[in-house]
Amino acid sequence: LSTYDLLTKRIDLLSERVSKLMIANATANRKIAHLVEFAGFSLTAISDFSKYFKALQANIENYVIAIAVKDTPGLCFTDALYADMQRIGVTINLTKKHWYGYAAIIDGGNLLAENSAYQKVVTVKATTEDGIAVVATSKPLKVGNATAISFNGVGGSVCRRGINIMVYDKTKKCVCDSVCFDTHVKGIDCHR
């Protein structure tokens, strides 16, 4: 190989490294921005749906998140709300899924279990890498109208209409929040 060929090859390798570093830097900058935005905030202080999921995303590696729908995901659930939920790993869009049961378990941003079904009880179960047994059950209006979420057998779902969420903090080894967002009303009421 000529010197030109060697230098061209080296430039290509360095360009590839720079591209990877730029992606890593953008990820780090996004993470820092989230941490700065939510520094000093506890999840329990947040009552806005979108901000809540941004806060979850900012510290996702430390959380085990269980979600269960009571009654219905609601007529006011939108693609924008789905985009918020995608931040933490949710893959099922609940837009126009009136009367669907839905449950999910996410560990550190990794989706462990997720399911939904029309007018059926939905239960998902998973054990996290840290050995935490998580169960989330969703019952739409006509098949029980309830939710049940538990971490190692200890429950605490708000159990109100809409998206019920319990968050387990792996660093503190306890549930740090239990909340419900009523996505059946335009204001997306928050209940604890």
Which positions does each model-derived feature cover?
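Short acidic-hydrophobic catalytic motif
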Residues: 11, 23, 34-192
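Accessible peptide chain termini
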Residues: 1-2, 192
